[in-house]
């Protein structure tokens, strides 16, 4: 499946090694921010933060058809259990052109937003 390499990178918490999976003009839609992030550098920054915030992350389902894949996951942020999906859209060359993340419940979204804000505001937090 086209999404296997993305899944492996996410499960290994190693999106830096997977940079070439993303199209240069990839669009990332966050569950906590209305405006999408544009470009590979922005996506890499966000995903580098996410792997530090998510605890006990694991995919539980993967469905792919044509140029779209949906990967369902479970994770934790602090004491909040979260369920979510990564929706991947692929360009003709196989690169990921869009990544949309949706999570539930609302308390999990709040915990995620707070943890991400703290991490992204810290100049030394991202490794």
Place the predicted regions along the sequence by residue.
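C-terminal and inter-domain tail/linker signature
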Residues: 1-127
């Amino acid at each position: 499946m086209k999404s296997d390499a993305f899944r492996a990178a996410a499960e290994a918490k190693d999106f830096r090694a997977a940079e070439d999976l993303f199209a240069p003009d990839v669009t990332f839609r966050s569950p906590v921010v209305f405006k999408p992030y544009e470009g590979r550098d922005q996506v890499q920054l966000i995903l580098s933060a996410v792997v530090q915030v998510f605890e006990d992350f694991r995919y539980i389902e993967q469905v792919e058809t044509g140029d779209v894949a949906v990967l369902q996951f479970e994770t934790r942020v602090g004491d909040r259990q979260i369920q979510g999906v990564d929706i991947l859209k692929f360009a003709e060359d196989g690169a990921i052109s869009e990544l949309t993340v949706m999570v539930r419940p609302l308390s999990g979204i709040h915990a995620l937003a707070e943890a991400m804000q703290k991490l992204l505001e810290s100049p030394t937090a991202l490794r």
